[in-house]
């Protein structure tokens, strides 16, 4: 008879620990992420290092300075950050054919539908739309879709031509970025920088 309360307490403790674990926080992503994107993210560090080497070996001095400024900050905690609202955003392509290209600023928006943040790049010829998932206190995972011009966004999981995956890092009070390893087009690493 005395074992019953002990079992209940053990069960409740296990349930609490499971709910608090990072795996529980990112459980939803495991049912969504494609195998190809899982592999891209698994190779993120190596891809980023190679792309950074190529970027620093090419591109204009101004673009190299911009690249270093964007990737240099240590990631900050997302816990006290409200991402919702309007943002300026620009793409930086590192590694690959052109080695380094920094594009101009466009408009992005982040909304919160109650189940999490959703990003949409509103202007420019190459756009993205997707959701964020907690990976750690200082890193979010982004899963989204790519569209050109005014084409509609296909749902995530439609295939490697349009699926996108990356890691988001906060760099300041109103400054963050998403790094996309091994994008489908043109580069080894795409960075979407966002400021307001």
Q: Can you describe what each PLM-predicted range is?
A:
Residues 122-129, 145-150, 180-187:
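Short, solvent-exposed aromatic-acidic interface loops
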Residues 4, 24-82:
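Amphipathic/hydrophobic helical signal segments and adjacent flexible N-terminal regions
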Residues 8-19:
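Bacterial N-terminal signal peptides
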Residues 78-141:
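Mid-length scaffold segments of soluble, non-membrane domains
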Residues 25-30, 134-148, 188-196:
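A short, hydrophobic/aromatic-rich structural module that often spans a beta strand
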Residues 64-69, 157-168, 172-196:
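Edge beta-strand at a domain terminus
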Residues 96-106, 141-167:
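An anionic, turn-rich surface loop/hairpin at beta-sheet edges
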């Amino acid at each position: 008879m005395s074992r019953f309360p002990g079992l209940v307490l053990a069960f409740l403790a296990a349930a609490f620990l499971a709910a608090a674990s990072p795996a529980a926080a990112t459980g939803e992503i495991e049912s969504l992420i494609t195998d190809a994107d899982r592999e891209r993210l698994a190779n993120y560090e190596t891809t980023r290092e190679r792309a950074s080497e190529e970027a620093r070996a090419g591109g204009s001095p101004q673009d190299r300075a911009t690249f270093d400024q964007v990737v240099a900050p240590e990631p900050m905690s997302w816990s006290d950050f409200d991402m919702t609202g309007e943002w300026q955003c620009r793409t930086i392509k590192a590694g690959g054919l052109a080695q380094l290209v920094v594009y101009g600023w466009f408009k992005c928006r982040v909304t919160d539908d109650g189940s999490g943040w959703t990003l949409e790049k509103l202007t420019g010829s190459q756009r993205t739309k997707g959701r964020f998932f907690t990976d750690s206190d200082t890193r979010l995972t982004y899963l989204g879709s790519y569209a050109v011009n005014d084409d509609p966004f296909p749902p995530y999981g439609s295939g490697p031509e349009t699926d996108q995956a990356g890691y988001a890092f906060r760099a300041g009070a109103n400054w963050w970025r998403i790094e996309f390893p091994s994008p489908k087009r043109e580069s080894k690493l795409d960075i979407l920088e966002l400021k307001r």
